[in-house]
Amino acid sequence: MGLGHLVVYQPDLDASAKFYTELLGFRVSDVAGPLGRPMAVSLHCNPRHHSIALFGGSGPRRINHFMLECNSLDDVGSARDIARQVGTPMVIDLGRHMNDHMVSFHVANPSQFAIEYGWGG
């Protein structure tokens, strides 16, 4: 089906969330973190739970992963089977997201970030 979402590390969550909401018109889906200190902000520009998620922290700005949305759960299973057959390292094996109920898995790629294959949610 296409690109589902992108997750990036962004040390300045406030400035980044402001960019996406005020300039690009995204809406905040949720904010997560302990004791009122945001560690992650999920934003959307369509009916999905999140189109982009921003993870805070002191590390460098970089892509954590992007998600490719499949047409069916069978497509997710087939992609996982192929990844395992060719020896692609699994970053996160098959499971369901708590926030959007997406069924997915994450694989490593040569660019040093993960690619998530998912369906539903």
Could you say what each language-model-derived stretch is?
Residues I52-L54:
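Conserved beta-strand in the GNAT
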Residues V8-H50:
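Core segments of cupin and vicinal oxygen chelate
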Residues P60:
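Long C-terminal interaction/binding lobes of large macromolecular proteins
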Residues M1, V8-A17, L68-I115, W119-G121:
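Vicinal oxygen chelate
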